[in-house]
Amino acid sequence: YAGTIDKSTRTITVRVPETYDIHQMTVTKLTLNEGATSDVKEGDKLTMTVPQAVHVTNGDVYLDWTIKAKKDEAKIKSFKINGIYMGSIDETNKTITVKVPQTLDITSLTPTITYSDDATISPASDIATDFTNPVTYTVTNNTATSTYTVTVKQIGKPSALYVGLASSMDQLNIEEQTACKWMLENIANSLYASFEEVKNGSLDLSECKVIWWHFHKDGGVDGKDAFEKAAPEALEALPQLKDFYKNGGSFLFTRYATNMPSELGIAKNASDKDKRYGMPNNCWGQVEADAETCGGPWDFKMTGHSDHTIYQNLVKGDDANSVYTTDKDYRITNSTAQYHIGTDWGGYADYATWRAETGGIDLGYGGDGAIVVWEFPAEGTSGKTLCIGSGCYDWYSINENYTEKYHANIAIMTKNAFNYLMNK
């Protein structure tokens, strides 16, 4: 495999097939200027999983070069319809599914496609395409070729909705986007929608059972002022969300979205300034790029509530009362929105006081007894509201090199939550 020399950056790039083993590559030919020597010689074996330095000397002059191996990759990395609707990519089966509203004319949709560097794609990106039937896309890059089948599914009346501040799913932060992608792939007849779309009535929610909002913000969201400053789009959609709730729709609020029951008037003490308007009173969070590394499984407690739907079929650990959610080396921001319980501070001396004042039912607890999972039961014609504010509830790890076991409980618990809320 010949190297391509870039003199401007003093880089040599050796392209190899996608499946080629680059752990020990032999230098079979190295041509230098007359009189020059190098610390890398023909016959040397190089570990090309990382770039290698080459020091070349000629008399009093020397230059450092970098040699790197680049595998021929032919992948579609993102597929977006009309600048809004993101496709879910199944890399194993080379399929892409895009869910769009029924109102779109699928005979003329424009996909924007991101694919591997140096590759070509056919049909081309940004060309109006008829998606009445599945469309095949072929990506080619030197020795690598991949063929993807793209299917567009129209949804007239979604059964479930993931809402967010962003106008399209690809603009969500990576934590939110990971959660949303899971929903689109695992909850039937589901869609992503922005709060603006909800506010404008762009979607027919007459058959929607559940609206989910998983709200992440680096550094945390603590208190009513901080929440309202961080999520003005959500507040603008309150009238429509209240109507949805009154007509029997249910909510799943996770992480900092657990402040929403106060804004919607679902929490009974939503007007009590001294009780933080019924919002979680103990909130914090880290930054995704500097996320903490788990030394082992993290967990919260479900003591007394193991029979609740949300806790069924979980991956079990040593403690029967624990819900384990992370694995060793998982990176987590520990983004938390919980209720501190105690006579020392926070306004809720005990669980009975919290229940009476908020109208909530506590379902999960932190190590210090804080309430980290709770629900507000249906009243009259309204739906139910389920909240998860535990810092252990986390979808994305910046480090993917961990062995997943307990983290599977995040998806299991969320699927259980949908089943619980959709079958009230």
Locate predicted features.
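A glycine-rich, often tryptophan-bearing local segment used as a flexible ligand/cofactor-contacting loop or short
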Residues: 223-328
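Catalytic beta-strand/loop cores that center a nucleophilic Ser/Cys/Thr
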Residues: 287-390
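C-terminal alpha-helix
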Residues: 416-424
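A short acidic/glycine-rich loop-to-helix N-cap element
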Residues: 172, 393-411
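Beta-rich interaction/scaffold domains
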Residues: 1-159
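Short, solvent-exposed loop/turn segments at secondary-structure junctions
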Residues: 167-168, 217-218, 258-259, 368-369, ...
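Helical hinge/lid and interdomain linker segments adjacent to catalytic or ligand-binding clefts
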Residues: 161, 165, 169-270
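Conserved beta-strand elements of the Class I
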Residues: 159-161, 386
